[in-house]
Amino acid sequence: MLKQRVITALILAAILLAKRLDAFSPELARKGPRVVIYEGSNKLVTREDKPGLKGYAVGFESLVDFVHSSAPLNRFVEQVVREEVKMFPRQAIRELVANALVHQDFEASGQSVMVEMYTDRLEVSNPGLPPIKVERFIDEFRSRNERLAELMRRMRLCEEKGSGIDKVVHLAEVYQLPAPDFRTSETRTIAILFAHQDFAEMSKSDRIRACYQHCALKYVSNERMSNQSLRERFKLPESKAATASQVIGATKDAGLVKADESDTTSTRYARYLPFWA
């Protein structure tokens, strides 16, 4: 038992602090995060393929800097703040990469954390399926690798339990981006940040996802979603109140939000809760 604990401690130290992961073992080297930058919106042309060689703590900030610097510019936010702004917020990239590192399944052989950037989106994925439903990422937290998570929190590489995804959703709203998407494949968990889209360009599913995430974010902030707050999220004028109501109605029909009946029965001043509240 003591020997196993020592081995586990050594592996943790190596995966966090190693100057080169491949100096320890081929298996550990394959756990380094890999960054791939594509020329277009598909995988046909690769601009850069950069395997992660350093331990997570040693190479984390430089990895995030590289991904952020490779992102396209956000001309829509630039017009407001009058300075160069990258499409994907650095803090959001940081949270998603840290989250993927912490929650990966280390027993999945031949797989690693992947950061893939396209012209219209950023995908961060990790081996292993989440222990909770993706719809609950905003309000729930359950770590697959608690010791690694605790060490990374102490090193200030990731947030306190459960707050990282909240920040990603909030930053998407601030930077006028579509709602991030959280998905699962057969073996991986995938988080996607999308490039800017005007409301008119968003699909119905994009609008529903944004409405649900906005509602959940409001709830965990001890607030409530309203027609007005959703219009502000989508940058819609007051004259588009009916449009916002249609989005709320579609999100209710999808079973993702519900009316807060404890507040008011008035349709005009209605407040909404996520389905799990």
Give residue ranges: language-model regions:
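C-terminal regulatory or interaction extensions
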Residues: 1-277
